[in-house]
Structures are given as C-alpha cells and as structure tokens.
Amino acid sequence: MKFAVLVFPGSNCDRDMFNAAIKSGVEAEYVDYRETSLSGFDGVLIPGGFSFGDYLRSGAMASVAPIISEVKRLATEGKPVLGVCNGFQILTEIGLLPGALLHNDSHLFISRNEELEIVNNQTAFTNLYEQGEKVIYPVAHGEGHYYCTDEIYQQLKANNQIILKYVNNPNGSYDDIAGIVNEKGNVCGMMPHPERALETLLGTDSGVKLFEAMVKSWREQHV
C-alpha cells in the first residue's frame, strides 16, 4: 500500500502524516499540489496547516489546486482519503464531505490535547478501536467549529457517518462532532490530529490505531 501525502503552500503537518503512514508499515510519498496525477497511489492523506495562508477562507484556495481532481477520482474509486484539520476543511470545500468548518465559538486559536469518543467503530478508520472508546488527540485550530444544516445532520445520523465526538466540546461544533465519513465510508475528515498522537513520550499514542485500521482495511480488500 502506498499513500500520497499532499503538500500545499502553508501545510505544516505533512511530515507528521508521512511519519504516521510509515509507522503503520506502508509506503508514502509527498505529492505537490501542482501535480496532476495520483497514479500508483492507494490512498490520500491531506495534512493540516494553513494552505495558501487560509486566504478567502480555510481550504478555499486549495480546493482548486490541480491535484484535487485526482483526489476526487481516488475517492470515487473507493480508495481511502483522510483529511485532518485543514485537510478536513479542504474535503468540505471540494464536496467530498458535507458541512463546513467555522471560527471557534471563542474566536481563539485552540492548541491542546482533547478527549474524544469513538462513536462509530465500524469504519475503515476506526475498526481497531472499541465502540465508545475514549482517546486523546491534540487539536490546533482557529476554525474548527463543524457546522451543517439540520437536514444534513439527520442524514449523518441516519447513515452512521459521525465517527468521532468531543467529550468536552472546545469549539462549538454541532453535536460535539469532531470527525465524519462520507456515505461510502472511504473518505474521512476530522479536526483533531491523530498523526500527532503516535508516541506516549509526546503525551498520547491514541492515533496509532487509526492509521493501522486504514492499512488493515485496505489489505483485507487487496491482499
């Protein structure tokens, strides 16, 4: 298995994503936003940061980068796509995930560890966690308030697309939502950073199982 780790101007978690992929036992390669092909890749990791300086709004300029059409193609083919923080914002901007990310209710940048609950462990991203398991991931965002219409929220609930919730909501997200998947279950976006939760020495290794789950799910289908 080989992951593409996208790199935009202003990305700052691409190395963490790369490290997470390698740690889970697969290959990874950085892919510049100006590239036009993801041929040979089995999945996509879209890192956090401030792509294009967050001008216009978070993820807006990245959403029209040349590589995005290929991200959409892989998603349509059912390959795993994970967007974290700014990556989540990009996924909503390009329509692969519903909703939007707004300014935190506090209007402050929040950077700390947060306790989260796995509310759906039947996905390619969470199948190594227990249902209801509590995990610790770092958060680092100013625009992490997940918002959607009531209609979309009911669809998310009905399709079991909400996978991760905040235990103590730090940003005002609708129903404490921290992470969701698309209807097919192969595209995931979350504001917390599992790629920064790989070592107990750094405070938490709760994120290891998320990347291992992605690899496990892929191998079950292809090996």
UniProtKB/Swiss-Prot annotation:
Localization, UniProt: Cytoplasm
**Major place of localization?**
cytoplasm
Q: Which PANTHER family match?
A: PHOSPHORIBOSYLFORMYLGLYCINAMIDINE SYNTHASE SUBUNIT PURQ (PTHR47552:SF1)
Reaction it catalyzes: N(2)-formyl-N(1)-(5-phospho-beta-D-ribosyl)glycinamide + L-glutamine + ATP + H2O = 2-formamido-N(1)-(5-O-phospho-beta-D-ribosyl)acetamidine + L-glutamate + ADP + phosphate + H(+); L-glutamine + H2O = L-glutamate + NH4(+)
NCBIfam families, sorted: FGAM_synth_I, PRK03619.1
Domain of life per record: Bacteria
Question: Disulfide bonds, which pairs?
Answer: none
State the active site.
Answer: C85, H193, E195
Q: Which PROSITE patterns match?
A: GATASE_TYPE_1
Task: Extract the SUPFAM superfamilies matched here.
Answer: Class I glutamine amidotransferase-like
This entry carries the following GO cellular component terms, namely: cytoplasm
Name recorded for this polypeptide: Phosphoribosylformylglycinamidine synthase subunit PurQ
Query: How does the record describe its quaternary structure?
Result: Part of the FGAM synthase complex composed of 1 PurL, 1 PurQ and 2 PurS subunits.
Keywords recorded for this protein, A-Z: ATP-binding, Cytoplasm, Glutamine amidotransferase, Hydrolase, Ligase, Nucleotide-binding, Purine biosynthesis
Entry keyword annotation includes ATP-binding: yes
Q: Pfam families per the record?
A: GATase_5
Report a single Gene Ontology molecular function. ATP binding
HAMAP family linked to this entry: PurQ
Domain called Glutamine amidotransferase type-1: residue spans: 3-223
State the Gene Ontology BP annotations.
Answer: 'de novo' IMP biosynthetic process
Pathway(s): Purine metabolism; IMP biosynthesis via de novo pathway; 5-amino-1-(5-phospho-D-ribosyl)imidazole from N(2)-formyl-N(1)-(5-phospho-D-ribosyl)glycinamide: step 1/2
Q: What does this protein do?
A: Part of the phosphoribosylformylglycinamidine synthase complex involved in the purines biosynthetic pathway. Catalyzes the ATP-dependent conversion of formylglycinamide ribonucleotide (FGAR) and glutamine to yield formylglycinamidine ribonucleotide (FGAM) and glutamate. The FGAM synthase complex is composed of three subunits. PurQ produces an ammonia molecule by converting glutamine to glutamate. PurL transfers the ammonia molecule to FGAR to form FGAM in an ATP-dependent manner.
Q: What EC identifiers does the entry list? A: 6.3.5.3, 3.5.1.2
